[in-house]
Amino acid sequence: MMLELLSDREIRDITAWLRSLPAVSNPGLKKTWLSDDIKKQLRDGSYPYDDDQPTPGVDPPDVPPADPVALGKHLAYTSCTECHGRDLNGWGPDDPTPSLIVAKAYTPTHFSRLMKTGIAANGRETKTGFMSGVARWRFSVLTDAEIDALKRYLDSR
């Protein structure tokens, strides 16, 4: 679900960035395990997706939304659903991720610190440390405006 919601501009920006990287040689890299039949089905839209998988064809916006709450929603559904579930209410039986309603317990300052450094509202790493690592690795590159937009959306739910 995350990638299918990226805007056309975001896809173009990512593609341009990937093309700007120097080529690498990796003769040990295995070719894709996808058969020619599966590749054809993916291209023509006939691949039988599992019931619990997102359905292709969601129309993403042409550009990321300008309104802060709408931008926050866009960021949440393109960045947070991987771990917190498609509805952002958490998931996972063994080591469940929390519902993002927990964001309401954070002040804007504490939320920004979590996103940039991985330090939770209590001044320590998150309970399992997983979100702390993800924040430092993935979310620390968000701008202050993006973090504010994400917080606004999560608070509005």
Regions found by a protein language model. Name each.
Residues 118-133:
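Accessory, usually C-terminal, subdomains that scaffold auxiliary metal cofactors
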Residues 8, 12-15, 19, 108-112, ...:
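An amphipathic alpha-helix signature
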Residues 26-36:
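Extended, well-folded interaction surfaces typified by the phenylalanyl-tRNA synthetase beta subunit core
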Residues 21, 126, 142, 146, ...:
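Ligand-binding pocket scaffold of soluble enzyme catalytic domains
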Residues 40-76:
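Electrostatic cytochrome c docking/interface patches
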Residues 19-22, 84, 116-119:
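Protein kinase-like catalytic domain
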